[in-house]
Regions:
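A residue-level marker of the well-folded mature domains of exported/periplasmic proteins
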Residues: 20-199
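Short, low-complexity disordered leader/linker segments with a strong preference
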Residues: 1-32
Length: 199
């Protein structure tokens, strides 16, 4: 939900900035066209793709805009850049890219298409954020902390563990926050929960 709201706010801001928009193909009615490129997953993956697409759909619905998504043919930087280019060539001037896997493609696209507004989620673009790019990152450790406290309060005692998705910074930060939340509950809220930090 937090990511969906953040994406909606960025799209609304971009809409206000680019309201004069593109006059090229697909923008016949002067509407900003919102596109999204998925990573290797689908738009119903209950993760990055789905959250991003729900934000794009909600923005399109609330602002009366056109939206679509493309699933690239593969998972390389070239595949992602090709999908971004395909959307751009069809008149999409605002494109959301969910996840760190898009970092290199976004760095290239922001230079290739200066009139394209790009949002990348969960990557701060160490190579540099262009003036037409917004990089959204979250404080996963804070959410993990709350989940750790809630877990400890729910079970009160015994053993708990954490199973994340990929071994990536966002999941690692959530895990660290989760462990700290369990430790906080043990020290301050009367729980006695054991957690093996390696899991």
């Amino acid at each position: 939900m937090k990511k969906t709201i953040a994406i909606l706010l960025v799209i609304a801001l971009a809409f206000s900035v680019f309201a004069s928009g593109s006059k090229e193909s697909g923008a016949a009615e002067g509407k900003l066209m919102l596109g999204m490129v998925t990573d290797s997953g689908t738009i119903d993956d209950r993760s990055f793709n789905q959250g991003t697409y729900e934000g794009v759909q909600k923005a399109a619905e609330e602002l009366g805009l056109q939206c679509t998504y493309l699933r690239p043919s593969g998972t390389t930087t070239t595949d992602y850049l090709t999908a971004i280019s395909d959307l751009y060539d069809n008149g999409y001037r605002f494109i959301a890219c969910p996840g760190y896997l898009f970092a290199e493609a976004v760095v290239q696209a922001q230079e290739m298409y200066p009139d394209l507004m790009i949002v990348i989620i969960d990557d701060a673009l160490a190579a540099g954020i262009g003036p037409n790019t917004v990089a959204i990152t979250f404080k996963e450790q804070e959410t993990g902390f709350m989940a750790g406290v809630a877990t400890a309060l729910k079970v009160q005692s015994g053993d708990v563990g954490f199973v994340g998705g990929l071994e990536i910074p966002a999941v690692q930060k959530f895990n660290w926050g989760f462990q700290q939340g369990v430790a906080y509950a043990n020290a301050n809220l009367g729980t006695s929960v054991n957690m093996d930090p390696s899991n």
